[in-house]
Amino acid sequence: MKKLLTLCVIILIAMVLYACQNEPTPEPEMTKPDDAWTIEEKVAWWINHLTIEEKAGQMIQAERTTNNGVSGATLFETTSYNLGSILNGGGNVPVGNTVTSWLNMANNYRQASLKSTSGIPIIYGVDAVHGHNNLVNSTIFPHNIGLAAANNPELMRLIGEQTAYEVAQTGMSMNFSPSIGLIKDKRWGRTYETLGENPEVAKNLIGPYIEGLQSYHIAATAKHFVGDGYTVFGTGMDGRLDRGNANITEEELLDIHLPLYQEAIDAGVKSIMISYSSINGVRMHQNKHLITDILKGDMQFKGFIISDYEATNDVSGSNFEDKIIRTVNAGIDMLMEPNKFDQAYRAILAGYDKNEIELSRINDAVSRILTVKYEIGLFDEPDLPDADLRNETSLSVARQAVRESLVLLKNDGVLPLSKDQDLLILGPGSHNIGIQSGGWTITWQGQEGNSTEGTTILEAFQAETNGTIYTSIDDLDQVDAVIVVLAEKPAAEWFGDSDDLSLNGRTGYQENIDLLEALSDVDIPVIAIMISGKPLLMTDYLEVVDGFIMAFLPGTEGLGITDVMYGDYNFKGQLPYTYPKVLAQVTHTMLDPNYDPDDYLFPYGFGLTYPDA
C-alpha cells in the first residue's frame, strides 16, 4: 500500500511539473523608450511596438468637442481612438475664454491621451496667426501683409516669440502659422495673410518668424502648400478665388513658390499644411508629385504634413474612404478631420486591410509625427510659462510692429500732426478693435466691435493729444484737421473674397464713400487712414484727401499709429503689393516682365517718409 501511495505521489508530482513546463512563460512587461536613447531610437521603438490601430489613431487630428457637445471628439473618444492630435478651430473656445479655461481644456485632453493604450500624448493645435487671436484679451499683432510692409526680420522673430509665449500659456503645442504664400489677385479674401507679392521679402521674413514661433515648445506650421495666392478668379468658392485653381508652370514653382517653403524647412519648421487649392487642375491634397516627390523628397522635409480642415472632402473618390486613402497615399501624414475623425480612422484601417495603404506609408507618417512630438518635448511634463497676457514686452513689440507697418502714400504737407491741434475723427474703422484687427480675431471671421482689450485709433488720439478730439461731422468748423478711417469688413477665407475692390463693395462700407464725398469740399486738411487687408480702390477719391496712410490690419495697438502721425517716429513701411489704379490691374505684380511703376496708383515698394514727403 505504501508503495502504491508513493507511486501515486510521484505520478502527481510529475504531472504538475509537466504542466508547469508547458505553461506559456509570461511576457515581460513592455518597457517604454529610455531617456538616454536618441529620438530616432525612441521613434523606432514605438514603430515596432504600436498596433496598426494605435498608428491609425496617431494620424488623426480631431476638433475638441464643442461646448454644446454637438461635434468634435470627447475625452473618451480621444482615449479610445488613440488620437494623435486635437485642435481648436477658429472661434471654438472653452467656456469663459480665459487662460485658465484654455489650460484646463488642454490638460484634460492631454490626460485623456495618456490613458490610451499607447499612452502617447496629443499635440494640440490652434490658429494663432497674428498673436493668440482666439483668446480674449491676448495681444493681437498686425496681420502678415502689414509685417511684409515693415520687412524687419528681427521684428518678425520677436512677434513669433511673443505669440508662442501667449500660446504656450494656454497649453497649446502646435500653431497653424505662418502663412507664407504670395499674393497675385488682390481680391482674394486671404490677401492679408500673405507676405505680399515679392518672394525675396517673404524669404527674408519666413525663417526668423518660424524660429520665434517655435519658442516655448511650440510646433509651427508653414502653410498653405503651395501657390494658394495665385488662384484664378472664377475657379474658387462661390465663383471667386479662395480654394480655386492656380495655373503655375514648373519654372514658376521652382523659382517663386517652392523657395519659400525651403526657407521654412531650413528654419526647422515642424509641420507643413497643404492648400485647399489646386495646381493646374490637380487638388493639392492628392498631388503626390508635389507632396511626396518634391516636398519630402527633393526638399528633404523631415517634419509631418497635415491636411487642412476637412479638405479631404474635395479630393477625388467615390466615397469618404476612397478620399482618405488617396490623401494618405499622396503623402499627407496627419488628417485634420474635426468631426469625421472616427470615419477617417476606420478608412485608414480599411485601406491597410485592403492593401491600398502600405504599412511603410503608415510607418512613415507616424514616425514623422512622433519625431515632432519628441522634438518639442511633449513626452515630458509640460513646462508652461506663467500667465501674463498683454505684458509690457508683448505690447511694446505689437506697437512697434504697427509703427513700422504703416505706409505713407500721400502727404501734402499735413503730416506730422501737432499734438496741439483739434481733430475730428470719423469713419467705420475709427473706434472698432474688431475692424482694426480683421478676420481670425476672437472668432474665425472676426467681428465688429470692441470685444477684446486694445486701443482703438480714436482712443489713441484721445490719449496723445493736447487738443480736443471730436467725433461728429457737425463739428467740422471746430477742428484743425479731419482723420477719416476708411475700412474693410472683418472676414476670413472665401467670405473675404471680393468681386471688385471698391470702397463700398462686398467687403467695404458705404460709409467710406459717404464720408469722402461729404469731405470733398472742406477747407481744412483731410487725412485718410485705410484699415484693410486689400488695396481698396482710391483712384476717384485720392484728390479729396491731403494725406493717405495704408495701415492694413494693425491689431489692438492703435497707439502705434499716433506714434507716427504725431512725428514721434518716422514712416518706414513700403507697399508689399501693387496698389491698382483700376480693377483691371488687380492681378499685376512686380514680378510681371513688363511691370511699369508709373501705371499704378502706387507701385510695389512705394512709401514716403517725412523728409521726402
Residue ranges of each PLM-predicted region?
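Glycoside hydrolase catalytic-domain context in secreted enzymes
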Residues: 20-613
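Positively charged n-region of N-terminal signal peptides that target proteins for export
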Residues: 1-5
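Repetitive helical segments and hydrophobic/amphipathic motifs
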Residues: 11-12
